[in-house]
Protein backbone atom coordinates (compact mmCIF):
# COMPACT_ATOMS: atom_id res chain seq x y z
CA UNK A 1 0.00 0.00 0.00
CA UNK A 2 1.40 3.40 -0.91
CA UNK A 3 2.06 6.12 1.63
CA UNK A 4 -0.73 8.21 0.09
CA UNK A 5 -3.23 5.38 0.50
CA UNK A 6 -2.16 4.86 4.09
CA UNK A 7 -2.69 8.58 4.73
CA UNK A 8 -6.13 8.45 3.15
CA UNK A 9 -7.18 5.36 5.09
CA UNK A 10 -6.09 6.90 8.37
CA UNK A 11 -7.82 10.19 7.52
CA UNK A 12 -11.06 8.37 6.74
CA UNK A 13 -10.87 6.62 10.08
CA UNK A 14 -10.18 9.91 11.81
CA UNK A 15 -13.24 11.48 10.21
CA UNK A 16 -15.37 8.63 11.47
CA UNK A 17 -14.40 9.19 15.09
CA UNK A 18 -14.01 12.95 14.98
CA UNK A 19 -17.67 13.88 15.27
CA UNK A 20 -18.05 12.16 18.63
CA UNK A 21 -16.38 12.82 21.96
CA UNK A 22 -13.35 10.67 22.60
CA UNK A 23 -11.86 9.49 25.91
CA UNK A 24 -8.67 10.99 27.31
CA UNK A 25 -7.15 9.49 30.44
CA UNK A 26 -5.27 11.58 32.95
CA UNK A 27 -4.23 10.78 36.52
CA UNK A 28 -6.36 7.65 36.57
CA UNK A 29 -9.49 9.50 35.50
CA UNK A 30 -11.17 9.61 32.11
CA UNK A 31 -12.57 12.86 30.73
CA UNK A 32 -14.10 13.43 27.32
CA UNK A 33 -12.99 15.95 24.73
CA UNK A 34 -14.21 16.59 21.20
CA UNK A 35 -11.75 15.67 18.51
CA UNK A 36 -13.17 18.41 16.27
CA UNK A 37 -15.08 21.59 17.05
CA UNK A 38 -18.56 21.98 15.66
CA UNK A 39 -18.51 22.82 11.95
CA UNK A 40 -18.61 26.42 10.72
CA UNK A 41 -22.02 27.93 10.13
CA UNK A 42 -23.86 25.99 12.82
CA UNK A 43 -25.13 29.39 13.99
CA UNK A 44 -25.01 32.88 12.49
CA UNK A 45 -21.61 34.43 13.30
CA UNK A 46 -21.64 37.42 15.65
CA UNK A 47 -18.87 39.84 14.66
CA UNK A 48 -17.36 42.06 17.34
CA UNK A 49 -19.26 45.35 17.42
CA UNK A 50 -16.31 47.59 18.32
CA UNK A 51 -12.70 47.80 17.16
CA UNK A 52 -10.22 45.68 19.09
CA UNK A 53 -7.37 47.33 17.20
CA UNK A 54 -7.92 51.04 16.62
CA UNK A 55 -7.59 52.18 12.98
CA UNK A 56 -4.42 54.21 12.60
CA UNK A 57 -5.15 57.94 12.31
CA UNK A 58 -3.62 59.81 9.37
CA UNK A 59 -1.57 61.95 11.73
CA UNK A 60 0.32 58.83 12.83
CA UNK A 61 1.28 57.66 9.34
CA UNK A 62 4.95 57.34 8.47
CA UNK A 63 6.28 57.28 4.93
CA UNK A 64 5.92 53.49 5.04
CA UNK A 65 2.22 53.83 5.90
CA UNK A 66 1.71 56.42 3.16
CA UNK A 67 3.26 54.11 0.57
CA UNK A 68 0.90 51.29 1.57
CA UNK A 69 -2.11 53.62 1.46
CA UNK A 70 -1.13 54.83 -2.01
CA UNK A 71 -0.89 51.22 -3.17
CA UNK A 72 -4.20 49.92 -1.78
CA UNK A 73 -6.29 53.11 -1.63
CA UNK A 74 -5.16 55.16 -4.64
CA UNK A 75 -8.25 57.35 -4.30
CA UNK A 76 -6.79 58.62 -1.02
CA UNK A 77 -9.67 57.26 1.05
CA UNK A 78 -8.42 54.23 3.02
CA UNK A 79 -11.15 52.28 4.73
CA UNK A 80 -11.24 50.95 8.26
CA UNK A 81 -9.76 47.61 7.22
CA UNK A 82 -6.64 49.15 5.71
CA UNK A 83 -6.24 51.67 8.52
CA UNK A 84 -6.54 48.87 11.08
CA UNK A 85 -3.93 46.75 9.35
CA UNK A 86 -1.59 49.76 9.13
CA UNK A 87 -0.84 49.10 12.79
CA UNK A 88 1.32 46.24 11.44
CA UNK A 89 2.60 47.60 8.11
CA UNK A 90 4.26 44.41 6.87
CA UNK A 91 1.03 42.52 7.54
CA UNK A 92 -1.05 45.11 5.69
CA UNK A 93 1.09 44.87 2.57
CA UNK A 94 1.15 41.07 2.44
CA UNK A 95 -2.43 40.52 3.64
CA UNK A 96 -4.02 42.82 1.05
CA UNK A 97 -1.89 41.94 -1.97
CA UNK A 98 -3.67 38.66 -2.73
CA UNK A 99 -7.22 40.10 -2.50
CA UNK A 100 -6.08 42.80 -4.94
CA UNK A 101 -5.30 40.06 -7.45
CA UNK A 102 -8.52 38.17 -6.73
CA UNK A 103 -10.74 41.24 -7.17
CA UNK A 104 -8.96 42.82 -10.13
CA UNK A 105 -6.58 40.43 -11.85
CA UNK A 106 -7.99 36.91 -11.68
CA UNK A 107 -9.44 34.99 -14.62
CA UNK A 108 -13.00 35.13 -13.25
CA UNK A 109 -15.72 37.27 -14.76
CA UNK A 110 -16.81 40.21 -12.56
CA UNK A 111 -20.23 38.58 -12.08
CA UNK A 112 -18.87 35.23 -10.92
CA UNK A 113 -16.33 36.96 -8.70
CA UNK A 114 -19.09 39.00 -7.08
CA UNK A 115 -21.22 35.93 -6.42
CA UNK A 116 -18.36 34.11 -4.72
CA UNK A 117 -17.28 37.04 -2.56
CA UNK A 118 -20.77 38.13 -1.50
CA UNK A 119 -21.80 34.58 -0.58
CA UNK A 120 -18.63 34.23 1.49
CA UNK A 121 -19.36 37.54 3.24
CA UNK A 122 -22.91 36.38 3.97
CA UNK A 123 -21.74 33.08 5.47
CA UNK A 124 -19.38 35.02 7.75
CA UNK A 125 -22.06 37.63 8.50
CA UNK A 126 -19.43 40.23 7.65
CA UNK A 127 -20.95 43.59 6.77
CA UNK A 128 -17.58 45.12 5.92
CA UNK A 129 -16.90 42.88 2.93
CA UNK A 130 -20.58 42.84 1.94
CA UNK A 131 -20.85 46.64 1.94
CA UNK A 132 -17.51 47.03 0.15
CA UNK A 133 -18.34 44.51 -2.58
CA UNK A 134 -21.99 45.32 -3.36
CA UNK A 135 -21.02 48.35 -5.53
CA UNK A 136 -18.69 46.12 -7.56
CA UNK A 137 -21.48 43.56 -7.86
CA UNK A 138 -23.82 46.22 -9.24
CA UNK A 139 -21.18 47.27 -11.75
CA UNK A 140 -20.92 43.59 -12.75
CA UNK A 141 -24.63 43.58 -13.55
CA UNK A 142 -26.17 42.13 -10.40
CA UNK A 143 -29.55 43.66 -9.62
CA UNK A 144 -30.83 44.39 -6.12
CA UNK A 145 -32.82 41.15 -6.38
CA UNK A 146 -29.68 39.24 -7.36
CA UNK A 147 -27.77 40.62 -4.38
CA UNK A 148 -30.52 39.59 -2.01
CA UNK A 149 -30.72 36.19 -3.66
CA UNK A 150 -27.03 35.63 -2.85
CA UNK A 151 -28.04 35.71 0.81
CA UNK A 152 -30.88 33.28 0.10
CA UNK A 153 -28.34 30.83 -1.28
CA UNK A 154 -27.85 28.35 -4.10
CA UNK A 155 -31.38 26.94 -3.89
CA UNK A 156 -33.07 30.30 -4.46
CA UNK A 157 -35.04 30.56 -7.68
CA UNK A 158 -33.47 32.50 -10.53
CA UNK A 159 -29.89 31.26 -10.65
CA UNK A 160 -28.48 29.56 -13.70
CA UNK A 161 -27.30 26.01 -13.08
CA UNK A 162 -23.66 27.10 -13.04
CA UNK A 163 -24.28 30.07 -10.73
CA UNK A 164 -25.97 27.72 -8.29
CA UNK A 165 -22.92 25.46 -8.52
CA UNK A 166 -20.65 28.38 -7.64
CA UNK A 167 -22.73 29.19 -4.57
CA UNK A 168 -22.83 25.54 -3.48
CA UNK A 169 -19.05 25.41 -3.76
CA UNK A 170 -18.77 28.43 -1.44
CA UNK A 171 -20.99 26.76 1.14
CA UNK A 172 -19.03 23.50 1.00
CA UNK A 173 -15.66 25.22 1.32
CA UNK A 174 -16.96 27.13 4.34
CA UNK A 175 -18.54 24.14 6.09
CA UNK A 176 -16.49 21.16 4.84
CA UNK A 177 -13.13 22.66 3.81
CA UNK A 178 -13.66 20.75 0.57
CA UNK A 179 -15.84 20.62 -2.57
CA UNK A 180 -17.49 17.28 -3.30
CA UNK A 181 -16.96 15.52 -6.62
CA UNK A 182 -20.30 16.35 -8.26
CA UNK A 183 -19.95 20.09 -7.76
CA UNK A 184 -16.24 20.11 -8.57
CA UNK A 185 -16.97 18.33 -11.85
CA UNK A 186 -19.72 20.87 -12.56
CA UNK A 187 -17.19 23.67 -11.99
CA UNK A 188 -14.63 22.14 -14.32
CA UNK A 189 -17.27 21.52 -16.99
CA UNK A 190 -17.28 25.29 -17.57
CA UNK A 191 -13.97 26.39 -16.04
CA UNK A 192 -10.43 25.52 -17.07
CA UNK A 193 -7.82 24.86 -14.38
CA UNK A 194 -6.95 28.56 -13.97
CA UNK A 195 -10.58 29.61 -13.49
CA UNK A 196 -11.17 26.73 -11.08
CA UNK A 197 -8.14 27.56 -8.97
CA UNK A 198 -9.07 31.26 -8.93
CA UNK A 199 -12.61 30.43 -7.82
CA UNK A 200 -11.48 28.21 -4.93
CA UNK A 201 -8.84 30.69 -3.80
CA UNK A 202 -11.29 33.61 -3.96
CA UNK A 203 -13.53 31.88 -1.46
CA UNK A 204 -10.63 30.66 0.68
CA UNK A 205 -9.01 34.08 0.90
CA UNK A 206 -12.20 35.99 1.63
CA UNK A 207 -12.91 33.50 4.41
CA UNK A 208 -9.54 34.57 5.80
CA UNK A 209 -10.30 38.28 5.39
CA UNK A 210 -13.82 38.12 6.77
CA UNK A 211 -13.05 36.03 9.83
CA UNK A 212 -10.17 38.37 10.71
CA UNK A 213 -12.33 41.44 10.16
CA UNK A 214 -14.96 39.89 12.45
CA UNK A 215 -12.42 39.08 15.15
CA UNK A 216 -10.77 42.51 15.02
CA UNK A 217 -14.10 44.34 15.10
CA UNK A 218 -13.47 46.20 11.84
CA UNK A 219 -16.59 48.28 11.20
CA UNK A 220 -18.09 49.12 7.78
CA UNK A 221 -17.00 52.37 6.20
CA UNK A 222 -19.60 55.16 6.30
CA UNK A 223 -19.48 55.63 2.52
CA UNK A 224 -20.60 52.01 1.96
CA UNK A 225 -24.20 51.90 3.25
CA UNK A 226 -25.21 48.41 2.07
CA UNK A 227 -25.68 45.77 4.75
CA UNK A 228 -26.41 42.04 4.79
CA UNK A 229 -30.22 41.58 4.66
CA UNK A 230 -31.17 40.82 8.25
CA UNK A 231 -34.48 39.18 7.37
CA UNK A 232 -32.95 36.27 5.43
CA UNK A 233 -32.71 33.24 7.75
CA UNK A 234 -29.20 31.93 8.35
CA UNK A 235 -29.05 28.43 6.90
CA UNK A 236 -26.11 26.44 5.56
CA UNK A 237 -27.12 23.15 3.93
CA UNK A 238 -24.36 21.07 2.36
CA UNK A 239 -23.84 17.35 1.72
CA UNK A 240 -21.59 15.35 4.00
CA UNK A 241 -17.93 15.77 3.15
CA UNK A 242 -16.73 12.96 0.93
CA UNK A 243 -13.64 10.82 1.70
CA UNK A 244 -10.26 12.37 0.92
CA UNK A 245 -9.00 12.30 -2.63
CA UNK A 246 -6.61 9.56 -3.73
CA UNK A 247 -5.60 11.27 -6.99
CA UNK A 248 -4.96 14.97 -7.62
CA UNK A 249 -7.65 17.09 -9.23
CA UNK A 250 -4.99 19.64 -10.15
CA UNK A 251 -1.99 17.68 -11.36
CA UNK A 252 1.29 19.17 -10.05
CA UNK A 253 3.80 20.21 -12.68
CA UNK A 254 6.64 17.74 -13.09
CA UNK A 255 9.95 18.33 -11.41
CA UNK A 256 11.41 18.56 -7.94
CA UNK A 257 10.09 20.44 -4.94
CA UNK A 258 7.05 20.16 -2.71
CA UNK A 259 3.77 19.11 -4.28
CA UNK A 260 2.01 22.25 -3.02
CA UNK A 261 4.42 24.52 -4.91
CA UNK A 262 4.21 22.35 -8.03
CA UNK A 263 0.39 22.41 -7.82
CA UNK A 264 0.18 26.21 -7.66
CA UNK A 265 2.74 26.37 -10.46
CA UNK A 266 -0.09 25.21 -12.74
CA UNK A 267 -1.36 28.81 -12.48
CA UNK A 268 1.69 31.12 -12.55
CA UNK A 269 -0.25 34.38 -12.10
CA UNK A 270 -2.03 33.02 -9.04
CA UNK A 271 1.20 31.64 -7.60
CA UNK A 272 2.94 34.98 -8.06
CA UNK A 273 0.14 36.81 -6.25
CA UNK A 274 0.28 34.58 -3.16
CA UNK A 275 2.77 36.56 -1.10
CA UNK A 276 0.84 36.56 2.17
CA UNK A 277 2.46 33.42 3.57
CA UNK A 278 5.84 35.12 3.24
CA UNK A 279 4.83 37.41 6.11
CA UNK A 280 3.87 34.50 8.34
CA UNK A 281 6.94 32.41 7.63
CA UNK A 282 9.58 35.14 7.29
CA UNK A 283 8.56 38.52 8.73
CA UNK A 284 6.09 37.88 11.52
CA UNK A 285 7.38 38.27 15.07
CA UNK A 286 5.79 35.14 16.53
CA UNK A 287 7.79 32.40 18.16
CA UNK A 288 7.96 29.16 16.18
CA UNK A 289 6.21 27.05 18.81
CA UNK A 290 3.16 29.33 18.91
CA UNK A 291 3.04 29.57 15.13
CA UNK A 292 3.15 25.81 14.65
CA UNK A 293 0.65 25.22 17.45
CA UNK A 294 -2.02 27.32 15.76
CA UNK A 295 -1.20 26.10 12.23
CA UNK A 296 -1.44 22.46 13.28
CA UNK A 297 -4.74 23.05 15.07
CA UNK A 298 -6.34 24.71 12.05
CA UNK A 299 -4.94 22.00 9.79
CA UNK A 300 -6.56 19.43 12.06
CA UNK A 301 -9.88 21.28 12.13
CA UNK A 302 -9.88 21.35 8.31
CA UNK A 303 -8.74 17.71 8.23
CA UNK A 304 -5.95 18.67 5.86
CA UNK A 305 -3.61 15.68 5.80
CA UNK A 306 -0.98 17.49 3.73
CA UNK A 307 -0.90 20.58 5.94
CA UNK A 308 -0.76 18.46 9.08
CA UNK A 309 2.10 16.33 7.80
CA UNK A 310 4.20 19.29 6.66
CA UNK A 311 3.93 21.09 9.99
CA UNK A 312 4.37 18.02 12.16
CA UNK A 313 7.40 17.10 10.09
CA UNK A 314 9.80 18.53 7.56
CA UNK A 315 8.50 22.11 7.14
CA UNK A 316 7.15 23.23 10.51
CA UNK A 317 9.02 20.61 12.58
CA UNK A 318 6.32 20.57 15.26
CA UNK A 319 7.25 17.16 16.62
CA UNK A 320 10.97 17.98 16.56
CA UNK A 321 10.41 21.13 18.64
CA UNK A 322 8.53 19.13 21.26
CA UNK A 323 4.90 20.04 20.57
CA UNK A 324 2.48 17.41 21.93
CA UNK A 325 1.10 16.48 18.52
CA UNK A 326 -1.75 14.18 19.58
CA UNK A 327 -2.88 16.71 22.20
CA UNK A 328 -3.17 19.35 19.47
CA UNK A 329 -5.64 17.07 17.72
CA UNK A 330 -7.55 16.63 20.98
CA UNK A 331 -7.77 20.40 21.31
CA UNK A 332 -7.88 22.95 24.13
CA UNK A 333 -9.66 20.59 26.54
CA UNK A 334 -6.82 18.07 26.46
CA UNK A 335 -4.71 17.98 29.64
CA UNK A 336 -1.29 19.55 29.89
CA UNK A 337 -1.72 22.90 28.15
CA UNK A 338 -0.47 26.10 29.72
CA UNK A 339 -3.11 28.84 30.09
CA UNK A 340 -1.80 30.76 27.06
CA UNK A 341 -1.64 27.61 24.90
CA UNK A 342 -5.19 26.70 25.88
CA UNK A 343 -6.36 30.22 25.03
CA UNK A 344 -4.61 30.08 21.65
CA UNK A 345 -6.19 26.73 20.77
CA UNK A 346 -9.60 28.00 21.87
CA UNK A 347 -9.16 31.09 19.70
CA UNK A 348 -8.28 28.94 16.68
CA UNK A 349 -11.37 26.81 17.23
CA UNK A 350 -13.61 29.86 17.59
CA UNK A 351 -12.18 31.52 14.50
CA UNK A 352 -12.89 28.31 12.56
CA UNK A 353 -16.32 27.50 14.05
CA UNK A 354 -17.73 30.96 14.86
CA UNK A 355 -15.84 33.10 12.31
CA UNK A 356 -14.73 35.37 15.15
CA UNK A 357 -13.14 35.24 18.61
CA UNK A 358 -15.27 35.70 21.71
CA UNK A 359 -14.71 38.49 24.24
CA UNK A 360 -13.85 35.89 26.88
CA UNK A 361 -11.15 34.27 24.77
CA UNK A 362 -9.77 37.64 23.62
CA UNK A 363 -9.52 38.72 27.27
CA UNK A 364 -7.75 35.47 28.14
CA UNK A 365 -5.26 35.98 25.31
CA UNK A 366 -4.73 39.59 26.39
CA UNK A 367 -3.59 38.55 29.86
CA UNK A 368 -0.61 36.78 28.28
CA UNK A 369 0.05 38.46 24.91
CA UNK A 370 0.13 41.94 23.41
CA UNK A 371 -2.35 42.78 20.67
CA UNK A 372 0.16 42.49 17.82
CA UNK A 373 1.09 38.96 18.92
CA UNK A 374 -2.60 38.05 19.16
CA UNK A 375 -3.22 39.35 15.65
CA UNK A 376 -0.20 37.46 14.34
CA UNK A 377 -1.40 34.22 15.91
CA UNK A 378 -4.90 34.64 14.48
CA UNK A 379 -3.66 35.55 11.02
CA UNK A 380 -1.52 32.41 11.04
CA UNK A 381 -4.61 30.30 11.71
CA UNK A 382 -6.75 32.18 9.20
CA UNK A 383 -4.19 32.02 6.39
CA UNK A 384 -3.49 28.35 6.91
CA UNK A 385 -7.19 27.63 6.83
CA UNK A 386 -7.07 29.16 3.36
CA UNK A 387 -4.19 26.87 2.45
CA UNK A 388 -5.90 23.79 3.91
CA UNK A 389 -9.07 24.37 1.87
CA UNK A 390 -7.02 24.57 -1.31
CA UNK A 391 -4.93 21.50 -0.49
CA UNK A 392 -8.04 19.44 0.23
CA UNK A 393 -9.98 20.60 -2.82
CA UNK A 394 -7.15 20.39 -5.35
CA UNK A 395 -6.08 17.00 -4.00
CA UNK A 396 -2.44 17.94 -3.45
CA UNK A 397 -0.65 14.59 -3.05
CA UNK A 398 1.35 13.79 0.06
CA UNK A 399 5.13 13.79 0.23
CA UNK A 400 7.24 10.66 0.81
CA UNK A 401 7.46 9.90 4.52
CA UNK A 402 4.53 12.13 5.52
CA UNK A 403 3.08 11.47 8.96
CA UNK A 404 -0.68 10.88 8.70
CA UNK A 405 -3.40 12.52 10.74
CA UNK A 406 -3.67 10.74 14.10
CA UNK A 407 -6.63 8.49 14.85
CA UNK A 408 -7.93 9.96 18.07
CA UNK A 409 -9.64 7.63 20.53
CA UNK A 410 -9.01 4.32 18.79
CA UNK A 411 -5.29 3.90 19.49
Say what each PLM segment does.
Residues 7-18:
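Bacterial N-terminal signal peptides
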Residues 1-4:
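N-terminal secretory signal peptides that target proteins for export/translocation
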Residues 19-411:
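Hydrophobic alpha-helical segments
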Amino acid sequence: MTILRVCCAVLAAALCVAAASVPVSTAGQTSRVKALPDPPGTARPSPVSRPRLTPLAEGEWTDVHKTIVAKYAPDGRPGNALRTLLNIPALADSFLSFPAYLTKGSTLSPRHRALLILRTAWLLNNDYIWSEQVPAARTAGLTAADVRRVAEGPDARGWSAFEATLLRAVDQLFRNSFVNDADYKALTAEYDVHHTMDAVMTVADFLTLGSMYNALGIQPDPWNPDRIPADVPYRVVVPKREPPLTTPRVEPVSGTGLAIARTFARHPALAAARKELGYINQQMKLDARTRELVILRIGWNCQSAYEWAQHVGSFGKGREMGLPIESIARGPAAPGWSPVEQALLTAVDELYRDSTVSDRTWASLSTHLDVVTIVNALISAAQYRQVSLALNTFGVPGEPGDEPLPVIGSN
